[in-house]
Amino acid sequence: MNNKDLKTKFIFITGGVVSSLGKGITAASIGQILKNRGLKVSIQKLDPYINVDPGTMSPYQHGEVFVTDDGAETDLDLGHYERFLDENMSKKSNVTAGQIYQSVINKEREGKYLGKTVQVIPHITEEIKQKLTDAALFHKSDVVIVEIGGTVGDIESSPFLEAIRQVRFDFGYRNVLYLHTTLVPYLKKTKEIKTKPTQHSFKELRALGIQPQILVLRSEVPINQETKNKISALCDINSQAIFEALDVDILYQMILNLNHQGIDDFILQHFKLTNFPTADLQAWQQLITRIQNLEKKVVIALVGKYIVLHDAYLSIVEALKHASYQYNCKLEIKWIDAEKVTSDNISSFFEDCDGILVPYGFGNRAIEGKILAINYARTNNIPFFGICLGMQLAVIEYARNVLHLQDANSLEVDEKTPHPVITKKIVDINLGGTLRLGSYSCHLKANTKSKAIYNQEIIYERHRHRFEMNPHYVSLFEKNNDFVVSGINPEQNLCEIVELKSHPWFIAVQFHPEFLSRPLKPHPLFKGFVEASLLN
């Protein structure tokens, strides 16, 4: 690895004691502060699982799959990175152990190691380090923040921790900073903060050759200076380098909290970066103040098949929140299991809802319940928003109940349907890598709701699907002058957006607009949906 021309600074974020500490939020918050101060920042996630990517992993295990512009199926933390930073991540932003081992094995098969015995050290660790420099060069970053997935002590993380240990030797002390996050438990009964888990986690990391310069303590209560001094003495770390990450009701409060404690000043000092302006976080403060003083409420029914784990729809929930905040209203999501929706009980699910959203999904489970929900929204003039599978099912519902195409269906659900209004565009080889992924253009038809919402002719949105509306049926659908295909991919003439003229707000899209929504820049479709729901 040639490091002479690389001027990038690296911040490595590790976690100890327990998983799900919020390393991703810490990384994203620091990234936003440093960007605000004038640095070009990118964030990279190193995941120690053997899967090549999370694309074929169950949503129940992994939550949503976040898709980048260039078509990478990635960890949901990349969604946090993009929302906090307002910067697009890429395929290089998420590296898994599966990718690393696959690359090394392929090189071995191609003879690139010249007959040497291939080992974790140096071959796996060198491959990891190459991924770090590739991302830094690709994004032209001043600072790359690298989150190491998992917990210190996990056997899967060992090669990654060894690789980042070596990076300091490769790049130099002033170009690398290690930040460790730990949980500091609070015992309510005795009103004590316990530091022992942090001490052990810190010790374990030092035993691996990594001495963190910054310690971020996750806690439900403020940590006093006496406790910080104790941790400082026992962990051999400057007490001024110990910061707290208090539990917050609003995620974006973390940006202000860390900035208020001066974490960015400490980082710039370590890197010897000078003459950067102080962070202007006024827009974030205004957003938080608005969230704390919401006056109205909007109730959105989310009809899904993975609702047991809300993280399966994380970006959709965040996009709904972004739009709701713009209209000064609190979002209440009514989580509805599509499998439980029947024609007999349907009104009980939706009678108190302002809008209905049917999101993505794969397979035929819970399909009919979603179609019933779409029919209820259409026939009762309730604002409806369909995303990905939600659009396909809106097409099926209209075909069956308005066009009277009996047994109309998707080829994904019924390969023998007499009316395949949804058809496959990609031939299966295996489940991985057969989807239409990434950003594609869409031309918006004049005099449609979609064109008015976007206020532009060409848009670019991210996709993740195998099936499309069958183009042979479009003329039949549009014949009655109510159903409109309002968005078309010009390169392949694929249907991207459908809407109904006669309905107050009925729009369904094949793409995933939630991936482009930002806290300070809500996506126009989500804004339109929430606005219509408030008027319902």
Swiss-Prot record:
L-glutamine binds at residues 60, 361, 389-392, 412, 466. InterPro entries: Class_I_gatase-like, CTP_synthase, CTP_synthase_N, GATASE, GATase1_CTP_Synthase, P-loop_NTPase. Pathway: Pyrimidine metabolism; CTP biosynthesis via de novo pathway; CTP from UDP: step 2/2. Keywords: ATP-binding, Glutamine amidotransferase, Ligase, Magnesium, Metal-binding, Nucleotide-binding, Pyrimidine biosynthesis. UTP binds at residues 19, 194-199, 230. Belongs to the CTP synthase family. This is CTP synthase. The gene is pyrG.
